């Protein structure tokens, strides 16, 4: 009724499914990637990807390095474990920070790549379909970027990579914005259809 576009990027898997159980309008994930390629809880599992396809929604692949590279995800978990270990030894904040610096020198942060971003896009297309994948860089929410994807000015390089993998111009147009525009139009249509209906508090 409100024409609200529901974004599931910051929710748990249980909440993803709860929303998909009750919504009659398509949803989006504005900045999430494929959990099958990077087991981050903010990424979308294949089972949910299939439900998004049934719902008519779109998963917009993010460029957050830790959501793209499993190596970076593992590195972050290892760094957190080392921080907790140092804190448990009784070190103050400065000592813990110094210890983490030493640890990071011995364990350099891996880098994600543009090719890995393309892998996530391709995986979501393969599981959910070309009509249900988009781009959601999240440049304003990350401390570092992926080489070759520093801003929206670098999107052509990503599209070129996908074109090399066989994506058609029509596929790329859907990815680059047409899919999200379709969802927005459908959400507005559902709002108009339900404008006179009372709220359903049972669900």
Predicted regions, residues:
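Histidine/acidic residue-rich metal-binding segments in metalloenzymes
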Residues: 1-28, 41-57, 116-131
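C-terminal helical cap
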Residues: 96-115, 119-122, 169-184
């Amino acid at each position: 009724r409100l024409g609200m576009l529901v974004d599931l990027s910051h929710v748990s898997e249980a909440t993803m499914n709860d929303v998909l159980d009750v919504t009659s309008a398509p949803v989006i994930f504005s900045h999430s990637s494929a959990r099958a390629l990077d087991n981050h809880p903010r990424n979308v599992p294949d089972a949910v990807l299939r439900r998004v396809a049934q719902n008519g929604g779109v998963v917009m692949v993010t460029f957050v390095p830790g959501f793209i590279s499993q190596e970076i995800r593992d590195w972050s978990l290892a760094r957190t474990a080392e921080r907790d270990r140092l804190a448990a030894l009784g070190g103050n904040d400065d000592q813990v920070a110094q210890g983490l610096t030493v640890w990071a020198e011995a364990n350099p942060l891996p880098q994600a790549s543009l090719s890995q971003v393309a892998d996530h896009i391709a995986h979501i297309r393969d599981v959910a379909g070309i009509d249900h994948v988009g781009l959601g860089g999240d440049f304003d929410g990350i401390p570092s970027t992926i080489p070759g994807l520093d801003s929206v000015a670098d999107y052509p390089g990503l599209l070129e990579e996908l074109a090399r993998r066989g994506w058609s111009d029509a596929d790329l147009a859907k990815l680059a914005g047409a899919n999200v525009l379709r969802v927005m139009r459908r959400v507005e249509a559902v709002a108009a259809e339900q404008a006179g209906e009372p709220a359903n508090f049972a669900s």
